[in-house]
C-alpha cells in the first residue's frame, strides 16, 4: 500500500485556525517563521511555515487565516481543498518556492490534528518504527557580512564541545589549500553543498572548476550536493557521479528522474520543498522501491516544523547524513557550549499526532 493511502481517509474536523509568529536573530541573519494552529474536536494540530521572506510572514499574520479552511473532511479532501485556496491572499509570495513551503505548513498542521482526533500517531498508522536519527550540522565558514573570509574556527569551536559531530559544509570561493587541508584533517565532513542552483541569493557561489577539482580529490568520501553541471565541471563530476546528490531542484519524483546521472545513489528529500504531503510520501515510496537513498533537510525551523522533519527522518531514513540537527546547532551561541543532544538522536515522538517532543 502506498504510504499516503494510510492517511488519506483520516477524518478531519477544523473549527478554527490561528497563527503565531516566531523570530530569532542568528548572528547577522534574522529568521521569521509562522506556526499554523488548527483546532477541532478538543485537539490542536500544528505546522510551521518556513517561507524565507519576512514580508510574507508579516502579511499573513496581519491578515489572519484565509476563508475556506474550516469544516469536516477526509485528510485528502482537505489537501485538495487547499489546492484551491490562495494561501498568499494577503500578498506575495516574494518567491515562487514559498507556495510549497506554506502548503507544507498547512498540511502538516492538518495531519497532526487528524491523527490526534483519530487517537493515533504517524509512525503507528504507517506501520514504521521510529529509530535513532543520525544527523549532521550544516554551516558555512564565513559570515554573511561583505568581505567576510572563511575560517575553520567556527567548526573547531563546535568540535571542541561535540567531538563526534559531523558536518555538511557550504564551500565558498575563498577556500584555499590551507583551509581545505585543515578541514580534511578533522575527518568530520560528510557533505559539501556546492549551491549550484542558487542565483541572486546571499548564499550564491561562483562556479569554480578548479575548486571543484580540489574538493573532489581532497574529500573522497563526501557527498557532493547540488553541483553546477557545466561544460567545465561535468568532466570532473562524471567519474564521481555516484557521490553527486541533489537538494534545491527536488520538488517531485519527476525532478529526481530529470537530474543528470539519474537515478541518483541518494537524494535530499526535504519535506517543505514538496508542498502537498501526497507528493512527499510518493517520493519516499519511489526512492524506497528503487533503492535510492534519502536524507532529510531543514529550513532553519524555529518551532514544531523542526521536530516534524526529524520525525519523518526517523521513520523513513534514520541512518543517513540527515541535515536536521536540533535547532540549537543553528545558533552559534548554543552550538559552542554543552547541552545539545548528540547524534544519533533518540526517537521522541508524541503518542498522538505528528509531533516530535523537544
Show which residues each predicted segment covers:
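C-terminal extensions of enzymes
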Residues: 330-358
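Broad gene-expression machinery/nucleic-acid interaction feature
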Residues: 33-35, 132-134, 266
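Active-site-facing alpha/beta catalytic cores
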Residues: 97-230
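Short glycine/serine/threonine/alanine-rich loop segments
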Residues: 120, 292, 318
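Catalytic core of soluble alpha/beta enzymes
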Residues: 175-311, 322, 326, 330-339
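Structured beta-strand/loop patches that form or line metal/cofactor-binding pockets in enzymes
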Residues: 1-57, 61
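Metal- or metallocofactor-binding catalytic centers and their adjacent structured scaffolds
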Residues: 39-118
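Residues at alpha-helix termini
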Residues: 116-117, 289, 315
Amino acid at each position: 500500500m502506498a504510504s499516503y493511502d494510510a492517511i488519506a481517509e483520516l477524518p478531519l474536523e477544523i473549527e478554527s485556525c490561528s497563527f503565531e509568529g516566531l523570530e530569532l536573530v542568528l548572528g547577522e541573519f534574522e529568521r521569521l517563521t509562522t506556526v499554523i494552529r488548527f483546532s477541532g474536536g478538543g485537539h490542536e494540530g500544528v505546522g510551521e511555515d518556513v517561507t524565507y521572506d519576512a514580508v510574507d510572514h508579516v502579511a499573513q499574520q496581519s491578515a489572519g487565516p484565509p476563508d475556506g479552511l474550516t469544516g469536516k473532511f477526509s485528510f485528502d479532501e482537505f489537501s485538495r481543498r487547499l489546492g484551491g485556496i490562495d494561501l498568499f491572499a494577503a500578498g506575495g509570495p516574494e518567491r515562487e518556492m514559498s507556495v510549497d513551503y506554506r502548503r507544507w505548513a498547512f498540511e502538516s498542521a492538518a495531519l497532526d490534528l487528524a491523527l490526534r482526533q483519530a487517537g493515533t500517531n504517524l509512525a503507528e498508522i504507517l506501520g514504521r518504527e521510529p529509530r535513532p536519527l543520525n544527523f549532521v550540522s550544516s554551516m558555512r565558514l564565513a559570515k554573511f557580512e561583505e568581505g567576510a573570509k572563511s575560517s575553520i574556527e567556527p567548526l573547531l569551536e563546535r568540535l571542541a564541545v561535540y567531538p563526534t559531530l559531523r558536518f555538511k559544509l557550504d564551500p565558498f570561493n575563498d577556500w584555499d589549500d590551507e583551509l581545505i587541508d585543515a578541514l580534511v584533517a578533522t575527518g568530520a565532513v560528510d557533505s559539501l553543498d556546492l549551491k549550484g542552483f542558487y542565483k541572486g541569493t546571499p548564499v550564491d557561489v561562483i562556479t569554480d572548476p578548479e575548486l571543484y577539482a580540489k574538493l573532489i580529490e581532497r574529500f573522497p568520501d563526501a557527498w557532493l550536493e547540488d553541483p553546477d553541471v557545466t561544460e567545465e565541471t561535468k568532466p570532473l563530476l562524471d567519474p564521481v557521479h555516484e557521490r553527486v546528490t541533489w537538494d534545491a531542484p527536488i520538488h517531485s519524483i519527476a525532478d529526481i528522474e530529470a537530474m543528470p546521472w539519474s537515478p541518483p545513489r541518494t537524494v535530499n528529500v526535504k519535506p517543505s520543498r514538496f508542498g502537498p504531503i501526497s507528493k512527499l510520501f510518493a517520493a519516499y515510496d519511489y526512492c524506497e522501491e528503487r533503492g535510492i537513498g534519502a536524507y532529510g533537510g531543514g529550513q532553519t525551523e524555529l518551532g514544531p516544523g523542526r521536530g516534524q522533519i526529524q520525525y519523518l527522518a526517523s521513520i523513513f531514513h534514520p541512518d543517513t547524513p540527515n541535515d536536521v540537527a536540533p535547532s540549537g546547532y543553528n545558533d552559534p551561541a548554543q552550538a559552542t557550549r554543552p547541552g545539545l543532544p548528540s547524534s544519533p538522536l533518540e526517537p521522541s515522538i508524541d503518542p498522538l499526532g505528528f509531533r516530535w517532543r523537544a
